[in-house]
């Protein structure tokens, strides 16, 4: 079966996360979005894990659903872990995503990690040992677990981050690198940017929302064609199998909040070339700029932009439906007008991904307004305008601009959508 999966999310037990991020609401929003499989997130948190054990039941190997309530959305057991440690004479901060095959394995992981740090303070626990040690701990408990470095290019808290990361997976994980089969590209990079590094050719690139609120689910995701089974899914990722792992769904990376360099408080947004021309200093405050993902990839890349390696998993770039609606109405996301139109469109179209990804224009025309339809078509064609994100500020996207060219435009044909 073909299905969409978003593995990296957070529960209400993580900091700065909506109280609505609980299993029942996640299942309902998964159906709205058209996401068949959601990561649970935060399985190390004691209270949340107790909820999982009481509310979920297995339906396939390593796949769960609610005992009561919305059952179309399935769950796979996941957590993000933060490791802050010294290695190679530097302070390192690395976030990692863990997949577990069953609740018994999660219990074993939690028992071990509980002896090494606090699990109840945050749904994303923080530990003082290395990322390499985390791999050893997890795989000693279950060899069926999968460990994936998370949002690998963000300046802070990532394996390749400009401020506290490494220059290769081998440098970070040392002898345990043989167990690293995949990385998460993060919102501020996409597969095309990662293809510029030959050292990642054998690594599978996955994409997830890292959602902290229900409406953010699926802003990045993965599309599979395989049985809804833990071993099948993990096998497709490990093997980088294009017959089973069809493509990833991406944010336009310019919209990510660490894409370009800059200083948010000074209103400075620089490309890597502009940063170098200014000696890495902010022209306003004269302090060092926050170096973004594009700059870091430029530093590490050994290929030019546009290179496509063999056996790569393709990707498409989408914009959340609520953002398209908001621009068509000239109001903000989260307003009653946008929320009402969003609900109407997904009722008519079946789900958000059906509307923005699957349905052909002639079918959308039956229930979508002309402006929303134009926005969806322009998005599918890549004809949009973006002011790149920087220093923790999301980029600003414009779909319905009357301009067809100019600075900040992204214009490219994407793979066929229907």
Place the predicted regions along the sequence by residue.
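Histidine-centered divalent metal-coordination motifs
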Residues: 8-12, 151, 212
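Short acidic/histidine-rich active-site segments
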Residues: 202-218
